[in-house]
Amino acid sequence: MKLTTSVALLAAAGAQAHYTFPQTDINGQLSGEWVTIRETTNHYSHGPVTDVTSDQIRCYELNPGTPAPQIATVQAGGTVTFTVDPSIQHPGPLQFYMAKAPSGQTAATFQGTGNVWFKIYEDGPSGLGTSNITWPSSGKTEVSVKIPSCIAPGDYLLRVEHIALHSASTVGGAQFYLACAQLTVTGGTGTLNTGELVAFPGAYSATDPGILFQLYWPIPTSYTNPGPAPVSC
């Protein structure tokens, strides 16, 4: 009985160290869980994706091809916030990507396959070269990104991604926590140069320097985010 209880407690502790992104908050309007965000496979376990060649690295959908019930609307230049359940509990970078639904599709029907994704944000650590490396998103219960004001209006998938690097010193050790929100963007100028478009899977290799990474020792002096550079207006 004691052994069973101990195993259960360990499993619960493991789940608590993991996290999901279940809701959006736009202009103070908080969606319900998995209402504007496609429900992820880890909605219960909170566990990560670890295989960058898996289709799950795209949106981590529990039921691929099944959209979220609603599409959120945001003004170009506005901010989209994702809630984190319970919080970001591992060290690593936060990144956001967008992909525009082609003509004839909506954010609900668009699957985000192929070279359609462009990065709009990435962060990195401070304290490199010291024993006190910190990451901007650590401990956050919500994370936000500004939609480029020069983006073209239309329907998009917005992909939030946090890469946990605490076990990333071996291939397959990095943990990816991610989700895709369904958006309609209004009011953009359409002048954005999206630069390099990438696919998920395909954008990352398990041996990319920002994915296969020794966080603790020897103490790192640099960090290179995986994927393309973020776009800007």
Swiss-Prot record:
It holds the Pfam family AA9. It catalyses: [(1->4)-beta-D-glucosyl]n+m + reduced acceptor + O2 = 4-dehydro-beta-D-glucosyl-[(1->4)-beta-D-glucosyl]n-1 + [(1->4)-beta-D-glucosyl]m + acceptor + H2O. One of its GO terms (cellular component) is extracellular region. Its EC number is 1.14.99.56. One of its GO terms (molecular function) is monooxygenase activity. It is found in: Secreted. Its cofactor is Cu(2+). Glycans are attached at N132. Cu(2+) binds at H18, H90, Y177. Residues 1-17 form the signal peptide. Lytic polysaccharide monooxygenase (LPMO) that depolymerizes crystalline and amorphous polysaccharides via the oxidation of scissile alpha- or beta-(1-4)-glycosidic bonds, yielding C1 and C4 oxidation products. Catalysis by LPMOs requires the reduction of the active-site copper from Cu(II) to Cu(I) by a reducing agent and H(2)O(2) or O(2) as a cosubstrate. Shows endoglucanase activity on tamarind xyloglucan, as well as on beechwood xylan when combined with phosphoric acid swollen cellulose (PASC). This is AA9 family lytic polysaccharide monooxygenase A. It comes from Thermothielavioides terrestris (strain ATCC 38088 / NRRL 8126).
